[in-house]
Amino acid sequence: MSIEIPAGLTELLQGFTVEVLRHQPADLLEFALQHFTRLQQENERKGTARFGHEGRTWGDLGAAAGGGTPSKGVNFAEEPMQSDSEDGEEEEAAPADAGAFNAPVINRFTRRASVCAEAYNPDEEEDDAESRIIHPKTDDQRNRLQEACKDILLFKNLDPEQMSQVLDAMFEKLVKDGEHVIDQGDDGDNFYVIDRGTFDIYVKCDGVGRCVGNYDNRGSFGELALMYNTPRAATITATSPGALWGLDRVTFRRIIVKNNAKKRKMYESFIESLPFLKSLEFSERLKVVDVIGTKVYNDGEQIIAQGDSADSFFIVESGEVKITMKRKGKSEVEENGAVEIARCSRGQYFGELALVTNKPRAASAHAIGTVKCLAMDVQAFERLLGPCMEIMKRNIATYEEQLVALFGTNMDIVEPTA
């Protein structure tokens, strides 16, 4: 007697298993009820529920648990949103002439299944499970490495001893113009921090490819492929001679992944409570937690400055932030020539306007008292918050109304036309 397994059942159960291993729920039955109810609600909301009596299958519902319908990012057109790299390693489409490498069929659910296969639990791993790796460095090399790593969000929450271990374990990799640092479809072996040089990001999807972004002497890539045991979903190619700092998979998982697991426990509930992130799927919200960093500002300290280029997006975790804008020739201005236009408190966000419109910062932000913010860099913002973009774009109209009331003009903050 042969029993036919319904299409998609395996994927559906794998997805559930991953979530159970990740959260370790005390009440498994209640967790299962919430998990499958959430899947059903997400599919109904999108109008893509795939089960019933009209040729629909639970398999399509299972696929939705791993990523669902592709969404558009901020600076990308007509490409599916990927979310397996902090700085674009796993972005979207690649140049049509990028036939030198073959792209795998990218499905976020099947990639997540490999997490279950590896069965890595950072809560159970002993600190000394792996011997410490040390690559000797000259004073000049270590100084350059520290400078390259100082703005890497993944390292922000490491204590001094953990950071020292990371620096010891990193090794220098020199690259030539045209060299492929990582290739789409390969297994993740190292996390890379750019010391110097320029690099292009190529992605091939559905037979159509293009360059989707680039790095200019700064940035990092490759971390989420190591965190989730997923294949590379992009090719990073050097466009000039340069140098990278690499961190091996073992050290990365022992230090970064374990530290990130602690951070995830701290911030999961906070991220899920934010209304503007409701359009993200559960797995996408978890990846937001993975890429955010924490920044603390003292009273009066400037967080962003009007006219500066945009590199980060901020969510207020605690405290209050004052948003001001300079406008000459107005009597209402403060001594520094700026008018207060808004205040942001816990759960509210700022800094998104420049990222949405691709223009310099339209306003400044200062801390009122001690302020703690969650920060996300521009690459992660573009990659992970695509589904939230319509909400943020709708806010532009509100900003314009406020500016017209204050200055008699919208200050030309609207999104530029292409």
From Swiss-Prot:
Region described as Disordered: spans on this chain: 48-96
Family matches, as SUPFAM superfamilies: cAMP-binding domain-like, Dimerization-anchoring domain of cAMP-dependent PK regulatory subunit
Organs and tissues of expression: Four types of regulatory chains are found: I-alpha, I-beta, II-alpha, and II-beta. Their expression varies among tissues and is in some cases constitutive and in others inducible.
Residues binding 3',5'-cyclic AMP 2, per UniProt: 276-418
Bias (Acidic residues): 84-94
Keywords of this entry: cAMP, cAMP-binding, Cell membrane, Cytoplasm, Membrane, Nucleotide-binding, Phosphoprotein, Repeat
Modified residues (Phosphoserine): 83, 85, 114
Protein name, entry field: cAMP-dependent protein kinase type II-beta regulatory subunit
Gene Ontology MF term list: cAMP binding; cAMP-dependent protein kinase inhibitor activity; cAMP-dependent protein kinase regulator activity; protein domain specific binding; protein kinase A catalytic subunit binding; ubiquitin protein ligase binding
Record's compositionally biased regions (Basic and acidic residues): 48-57
UniProt-annotated binding residues for 3',5'-cyclic AMP 1: 154-275
Region spans: Dimerization and phosphorylation: 2-153
PTMs per UniProt: Phosphorylated by the activated catalytic chain.
Cellular component aspect of the GO annotation: cAMP-dependent protein kinase complex; centrosome; ciliary base; cytoplasm; cytosol; dendritic shaft; dendritic spine; extracellular exosome
An annotated GO BP: response to antipsychotic drug
Compartments reported by the entry: Cytoplasm; Cell membrane
Similarity annotation: Belongs to the cAMP-dependent kinase regulatory chain family.
Function of the protein: Regulatory subunit of the cAMP-dependent protein kinases involved in cAMP signaling in cells. Type II regulatory chains mediate membrane association by binding to anchoring proteins, including the MAP2 kinase.
PROSITE patterns assigned to the protein according to its UniProt record, in alphabetical order: CNMP_BINDING_1, CNMP_BINDING_2, CNMP_BINDING_3
Modified residues (Phosphothreonine): 69
InterPro entries: cAMP-dep_PK_reg_su-like, cAMP_dep_PK_reg_su, cAMP_dep_PK_reg_su_I/II_a/b, cNMP-bd_CS, cNMP-bd_dom, cNMP-bd_dom_sf, RmlC-like_jellyroll
Assembly: The inactive form of the enzyme is composed of two regulatory chains and two catalytic chains. Activation by cAMP produces two active catalytic monomers and a regulatory dimer that binds four cAMP molecules. Interacts with PRKACA and PRKACB. Interacts with the phosphorylated form of PJA2. Forms a complex composed of PRKAR2B, GSK3B and GSKIP through GSKIP interaction; facilitates PKA-induced phosphorylation and regulates GSK3B activity.
Organism whose genome encodes this protein: Homo sapiens (Human)
Pfam families: cNMP_binding, RIIa
